[in-house]
């Protein structure tokens, strides 16, 4: 059985848009660049040709990866999860015990994780600890050096 890719509907929609862009925009652009580079003649010392071929390989690899993620996407349905329970697709807000600054993240599948946008992978150490916990729970979150104790203050 193939590996499934748990994700939100939003994550799946973004992958579909990325795939469309790769196939309808990026792929034709790089094919055109290869044609232009070929017209320069000798390919053995043609850096533009080599760069375009490298980009083509990257694009084709990404298309394959995205198609696989879409094919085996498992959309998360939180209807059966308690409203105050941390789960994939939900936003969780917590505060380090003894501090006042809150941190909020959405827990998403690995395919859509982007920590800079506040989206952390369900496979990350912090998400693994938080998933299944509820508002008011106090948990120890592993850090590269040591750990921190946090209290879950909000789940939505």
UniProtKB/Swiss-Prot annotation:
This is Transcription elongation factor GreA. PROSITE patterns: GREAB_1. GO terms for molecular function: DNA binding; RNA polymerase binding. Belongs to the GreA/GreB family. Residues 7-27 form a coiled coil. InterPro entries: GreA/GreB_C_sf, TF_GreA/GreB_CS, Tscrpt_elong_fac_GreA, Tscrpt_elong_fac_GreA/B, Tscrpt_elong_fac_GreA/B_C, Tscrpt_elong_fac_GreA/B_fam, Tscrpt_elong_fac_GreA/B_N, Tscrpt_elong_fac_GreA/B_N_sf. Keywords: Coiled coil, DNA-binding, Transcription, Transcription regulation. Signal peptide: none annotated. Necessary for efficient RNA polymerase transcription elongation past template-encoded arresting sites. The arresting sites in DNA have the property of trapping a certain fraction of elongating RNA polymerases that pass through, resulting in locked ternary complexes. Cleavage of the nascent transcript by cleavage factors such as GreA or GreB allows the resumption of elongation from the new 3'terminus. GreA releases sequences of 2 to 3 nucleotides. GO terms for biological process: DNA-templated transcription elongation; regulation of DNA-templated transcription elongation. NCBIfam families: greA, PRK00226.1-1, PRK00226.1-2, PRK00226.1-4. It comes from Lactococcus lactis subsp. lactis (strain IL1403).
């Amino acid at each position: 059985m193939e590996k499934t890719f748990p994700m939100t509907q939003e994550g799946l929609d973004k992958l579909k848009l990325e795939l469309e862009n790769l196939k309808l925009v990026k792929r034709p652009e790089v094919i055109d660049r290869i044609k232009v580079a070929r017209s320069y003649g000798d390919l053995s010392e043609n850096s533009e040709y080599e760069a375009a071929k490298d980009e083509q390989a990257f694009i084709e690899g990404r298309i394959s990866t995205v198609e696989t993620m879409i094919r085996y996407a498992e959309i998360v349905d939180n209807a059966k999860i308690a409203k105050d329970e941390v789960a994939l697709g939900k936003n969780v807000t917590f505060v380090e015990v003894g501090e006042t600054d809150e941190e909020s993240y959405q827990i998403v599948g690995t395919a859509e994780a982007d920590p800079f946008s506040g989206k952390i992978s369900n496979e990350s150490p912090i998400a693994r600890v938080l998933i299944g916990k509820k508002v008011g729970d106090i948990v120890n979150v592993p850090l590269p050096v040591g750990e921190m104790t946090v209290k879950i203050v909000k789940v939505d």
